[in-house]
UniProtKB/Swiss-Prot annotation:
Interacts with TOM40, TOM70 and MBF1. GO terms for cellular component: mitochondrial outer membrane; mitochondrion. It is found in: Mitochondrion outer membrane. This is Protein TOM71. Residues 33-639 are cytoplasmic. The keyword Kinase does not apply. It comes from Saccharomyces cerevisiae (strain ATCC 204508 / S288c). Involved in MBF1-mediated mitochondrial morphogenesis. Belongs to the Tom70 family. Present with 4110 molecules/cell in log phase SD medium. The modification Phosphoserine is found at S55. The chain crosses the membrane at residues 15-32. Residues 1-14 are mitochondrial intermembrane. TPR repeats lie at residues 127-160, 162-194, 345-378, 379-411, 412-445, 447-479, 480-513, 530-563, 565-597.
Amino acid sequence: MAENSLLRFITKNKVAILATVSAGTAAVGAYVYYQQIKQQQQQQLKGTKDNRRQSEAFAGQNEDEADLKDDGSVVSGSNKRKKKKNKRKRNNKAKSGEGFDYPSLPNGEPDIAQLKGLSPSQRQAYAVQLKNRGNHFFTAKNFNEAIKYYQYAIELDPNEPVFYSNISACYISTGDLEKVIEFTTKALEIKPDHSKALLRRASANESLGNFTDAMFDLSVLSLNGDFDGASIEPMLERNLNKQAMKVLNENLSKDEGRGSQVLPSNTSLASFFGIFDSHLEVSSVNTSSNYDTAYALLSDALQRLYSATDEGYLVANDLLTKSTDMYHSLLSANTVDDPLRENAALALCYTGIFHFLKNNLLDAQVLLQESINLHPTPNSYIFLALTLADKENSQEFFKFFQKAVDLNPEYPPTYYHRGQMYFILQDYKNAKEDFQKAQSLNPENVYPYIQLACLLYKQGKFTESEAFFNETKLKFPTLPEVPTFFAEILTDRGDFDTAIKQYDIAKRLEEVQEKIHVGIGPLIGKATILARQSSQDPTQLDEEKFNAAIKLLTKACELDPRSEQAKIGLAQLKLQMEKIDEAIELFEDSAILARTMDEKLQATTFAEAAKIQKRLRADPIISAKMELTLARYRAKGML
């Protein structure tokens, strides 16, 4: 629960504005923006679609065809109708050459040699004439002729960006997107803030899958203020989402079918295995087995696991894999030895749940089913149920919890984990019954007490929840779990000062434990509050609290380097410090460590948004505009 508080703060507390991607001070930038844009689209679906049509249609128009005024506003409907009424007349003029006056060859083509001999001002004037004829060919959808006349105009005046931009509009119509990019780039080399060229190049890059390039141009457009944000923002959001998914899929394909192969944080492991009786689990190895080497390997693995230390978890992971391989080999030669089957089932069961914790669901289910086939235990059914619950197959996973109950109705972890599932599904009545059952079967385990207290809070009974926490503190005065989870509830209520005191108590209690209990949870929880408090005044950062949050999260990353929440929180603060490279590395690490696809996508989105920010910052002109944008938002109290 403690690690999740930072994520909740990040995703709920920042203003969703375009500057979070392009200017970057607001911590999570793109993901918050992405989530809130989706809500806006649901609320204003028609308006958003209309705006998108306006901006994307504009990308394919030439300089004289765009139904937008010079200030970026849309031309009135009556003016549009006038243009349509005159379209046939203009088409006829384009074919005949009527209305254009420039030196021509006998075949009617412009005499470029003669035109080049004129003065610069005359060349520019004739270049406009040639461009105008190109525009009429464009209107008639004779794009090859339009391109030819725009090229003539360029020969006379190569420093006019409109000519290159109009050629790009022709190539949009013919579908040659590489040429669109080529000619919009030429226009932008002359005039870097040319809005039509920026939009066209962004659209072409999106179609070609160059989403980062598209985001760059769209961010510049937004900073320039050339378009209504409602037109540009959905395009930026769309490209950011596509880029994040592209990168995430590429990363997943490198490790296809094997999950992350990285253990979750020590804090998560301690919480997961905390409900199990360590002495009972270690002693579950059948000592009558004749296979001493395999027995010793399995026994050592479980002892290491329940030592609940950083080294213990890593070694247990390795030993369980080796133990499973050894038992597979032994079973190939002997399938009737009962002690062998029991120990093999135990090794497969724990290796399976480790695969699950590493987000390798398929292998986890195969190993757990194999364990059940050899020798079913409550744990094998519990673990299999959890793998199915992770796939949101609710009906099936409850079936396996029931099998665990049928096998041993007095086993506390079954009720605890099933209660957790009921809790998640907001079935508080059944959750309470299961937590109470787990509590009665093992009154010396703190976790059912904590969940019952949290359950009261979720039901809107804070006073009762607080009283239950206080009673639990009296029973477990030295355990850091109680103040840690109580601090989570206080944080959720906005009682930050009291929450910080509880986190400090939890931190001191954790430091004197031989085993990991709540790990870095108190550090992350306190850092979350301090980070939030440091930015309460939009006009001035509280540097003392901000630096304290940085220090806590840095320490958390050192103590538990596999914690994606510590890294993503530290990355957010590094981004505020303009330490973009460090932020990107931390976001990318978080994406690797994250367990769910949503979490991986979130961290990847952060990283890709930060990369765009870095690219924008590298341009001194754009960087200056970003600072102006930030100053404007700060003045309005939006950051």
